[in-house]
């Protein structure tokens, strides 16, 4: 069981990145918000980075804008970047669940099963708010589980959720 606990985060990363590739293929075929967030087919010559410094969905555009305009990163790289960002939230959630499970093997198994639910990985691996909001949500849960009701991290996570949503 100890070996699994050590390797599982790496397997979880591979699993999460697999969903980034699946999400990329899905958006290429079915289209979606990710195309808008990555400014596909849009002329950015008259746009400024500061134009997107607003709460809500513009937060995603604010983060994507320099990657597209200044670095000319391809569409697939957005999925990789947002997926890696959201994986930080997945990892926080996994560690929180493992800490809560303690030495209870059944709870460890349940936590592993929960961490493998496809929806958690698919929606948070796309370019969008879901990827960004996962970190503050999991930080919020981790802080509550530790009974840190007024910590700086908890308050910052609430602020981040408010800005992103």
Which residues fall in each region the model found?
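Start-transfer (signal-anchor) and selected internal transmembrane alpha helices
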Residues: 1-18
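Membrane-interface transmembrane helices that cradle and orient dolichyl/undecaprenyl
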Residues: 100-101, 138-151
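Transmembrane helices and adjacent periplasmic/lumenal helix-loop junctions
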Residues: 131, 156-165
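Short acidic/glycine- and proline-prone juxtamembrane loop motifs at membrane-interface regions
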Residues: 125-130
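Extracytoplasmic catalytic/substrate-binding loops of multi-pass membrane glycan-assembly enzymes
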Residues: 26-40, 49-64, 72-73
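Transmembrane and membrane-interface helices of multi-pass
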Residues: 108-118
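Transmembrane-helix motifs of polytopic, lipid-linked glycan transferases
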Residues: 80-101
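Residue-level hotspots within the lipid-embedded alpha helices of multi-pass solute transporters
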Residues: 53-54, 82-87, 162-163
